[in-house]
C-alpha cells in the first residue's frame, strides 16, 4: 500500500477538489480529517460523507470545540489580540490546532504526508507548514492548490467535471472560513474595495438596525482574566463565546470590513463576523484598565500587539510567543471582576465596572466632599516632572 496522505478537510471547494486530485495524480490514498471548531453550518457527518464521495478512503471528525475555546480563544482574550487593531485572529488561531490534530492523525493512520488546501497568496500556507515543521519535521507537506496554481475557476471546473459536491458557483465565489470564534469571507466581488458587502455576505450577525429598539445589556464576569460568568450565571469558555455570539450577533455587533496586510506582502480585503470575540476582548481590556497598574498596562499593550502579530504570522509555537504568555499569565493575577456592556446597533458600550481587585480609589478620584488627595503635593510633582523639558527649552532659546 502506498503511503497515505492526511488532508486537512474543511468540506469546501479547495479541499474537496484536493481529495480527488491527489488520488488521480499521485495514486495515494487520502485520509480526510475534519476538525469541529464550532463552525456550525453543515452537520459534520455530512462533511465526512462528502469526503468519502470525493474519494477519501477514510474520513475522521475530531470534536475540538472545548479545546479550541480554552486553549486558543482564551489566550486571544488574555492578550486583547486584534491584528492591526481590528482583526481578532478568527482563522489564525484555528490553524495550529488543526495542525496538532493532523499530526496526531498522521501517526495514527500511518501517513507520512500531510496536505492542506491553501493558496500561495494567503497566510494559511505559512501557518500550516511552520506548524508542521515545529511539531513533526519528519512529515512531508503537500499543497496542491498552491504548487499547481489552481484558480477558483479551475477548481470549480474540476469539481463540475468530476461531480464533486460543493456549495460554490462562479456567480457567488465566496471563500468562507468559520469557527465558534468568528467567520471570515473573502474573494468574489469583495475584492473590489469600493463594493459594499451585500446581505448574503453575513451569517453570524443581524443587520444592526433590526433590533434597534431593544438593546441588550450583558454583564461578563472574569477570574484571573478568564470569562467565567454571564449575567451572574457560570459558563465554560465555549458557552461564553456561544452565548455572546448569539446575543451580540442579534445586535449586529462584530461586523468588520478590513483591508489587512498579509504576511506574504500583499493587502487583502476581508469581511469578518466575530460578535462574541469582540465583546469578550472589549470586556477583558476594560477590566484591565481597572485592575492593572499604569506602567504594567502600558507595557502590556505592546506585548498584546506583538502576540497578535506572531499568531497572525504563523508563529504559534515560537519561543517569543511562549515567553510572552508567561508574562501575560503574571499580569492576569488581579484581573477579576465584572464588566457591564450594552450591545446595540452594531456597537459595544461599556457602562459599568466592578472588581475587588480594582486600583480605582473613589476617595482619591472624587472632586466632591470626601476627597483625600493631597493637592499640595501636586506643585512639586509638576515641577520635577517638567524639569527636563524646561532645561531643554532653555538651551534651545539661548
From Swiss-Prot:
| Any one Gene Ontology BP term | argininosuccinate metabolic process
Q: Which NCBIfam families would you find in this protein's record? A: argG, PRK00509.1
Name the residues that bind L-citrulline. 87, 123, 127, 175, 260, 272
User: Quick one: which pathway?
Assistant: Amino-acid biosynthesis; L-arginine biosynthesis; L-arginine from L-ornithine and carbamoyl phosphate: step 2/3
**Positions that bind L-aspartate:** 119, 123-124
A Pfam family matched in the record: Arginosuc_syn_C
Which PANTHER family is this protein grouped with?
Answer: ARGININOSUCCINATE SYNTHASE
Q: How does it assemble?
A: Homotetramer.
In the UniProt record, the gene name given for this protein reads argG
Which reaction is the catalytic activity of this chain? L-citrulline + L-aspartate + ATP = 2-(N(omega)-L-arginino)succinate + AMP + diphosphate + H(+)
Protein's name according to its UniProt entry: Argininosuccinate synthase
Quote the EC number.
6.3.4.5
Q: What is the similarity comment for this entry?
A: Belongs to the argininosuccinate synthase family. Type 1 subfamily.
What are the binding positions for ATP in this chain?
8-16, 117
UniProt source species: Mycobacterium ulcerans (strain Agy99)
Q: Does the keyword Nucleotide-binding apply?
A: yes
**Molecular function (GO) terms listed?**
argininosuccinate synthase activity; ATP binding
